[in-house]
Amino acid sequence: MGRSRCLLRKNNRILIWVFDMTIYFYGQDFKYEIEGVCKLFFPLIRFTHIYNAPIKPPDGDEDYVHTVRLRRTDETLLRVEVQLDGESTVQEESIKNAQTRYDNECERVLCVLLYQILQARIGVSPRWGILTGVRPVNIIQRERQTGKNDTQIAAWLSEKYLVSADKLKLAFLTADTQEPMLRSMRPASFSLYVAIPFCTSRCSYCSFVSHAITTKKATDKVDEYVRLLCRELEKAADVAKQEKLVLDTIYIGGGTPTALSAQQLQTVTDAVNRYFDTAGAR
């Protein structure tokens, strides 16, 4: 496995790394979130994943993240070791087994330990903390529904997810802006999501299931996708009518809708208007 290579420094601070890294999983397989935290610090990373790994990391000078969940009688040991350029750093924490969302808490703690190690080693502090691939507003709305006030929620997000003060302010502002719209939703209403899983190029930070259509072989398949998408819209409209649902909003995305040609996009929007009653949509 290749050693890490620093590409860019500024004021003696590492800005960009390119390297191969192995992530080892012992006692769990929280790939998505652990990999997501790594990408906060190393956007150009290349991963190898080893599941059912040994409880101890390998000898040698490879770059790795080694994660452990060791469940004991009453407690679970959570341990993260990171090796970069031959230097390893370890953090660990134990949690009680008797937890309502045991797996979620194990995953969260492992991500916090990993974040703290990389924050110290790399010298940057991603302002959304360990939140990756999730809309913070959804968390705020969920916690409000449990009866928590905003002060309690902010303290919880700061302590448990390491979200910075400026991002907390933004998240609460967004939640407050959305709340009147959510309250105004009608009974039996639904939102239509029209998936266009194509882009003209793929962004390095993207976590969506989308494909760059940069070759003729790929673009040749788009017409067929549009044809089948229109059939799916017709079937979805039939179900909506049977269930007496009212269309509230339409979202076209996925991908990048304008990756389709103007004619292809027109075909999709025509199908939406043909099969659905859009008169009451916002």
Please describe what each predicted stretch is.
Residues 95-106, 110-114:
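Extended acidic/polar, glycine-enriched regions
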Residues 63-98:
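Amphipathic beta-strand/beta-sheet edge segments enriched in Tyr/Trp
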Residues 20-62:
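Short Lys/Arg-enriched alpha/beta "domain-start" segment
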Residues 231-282:
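Conserved SAM/AdoMet-binding glycine-rich loop
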Residues 122-125, 145-192, 243:
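N-terminal [4Fe-4S]-dependent radical SAM core
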Residues 188-226:
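Canonical Radical SAM [4Fe-4S] cluster-binding loop centered on the CxxxCxxC motif
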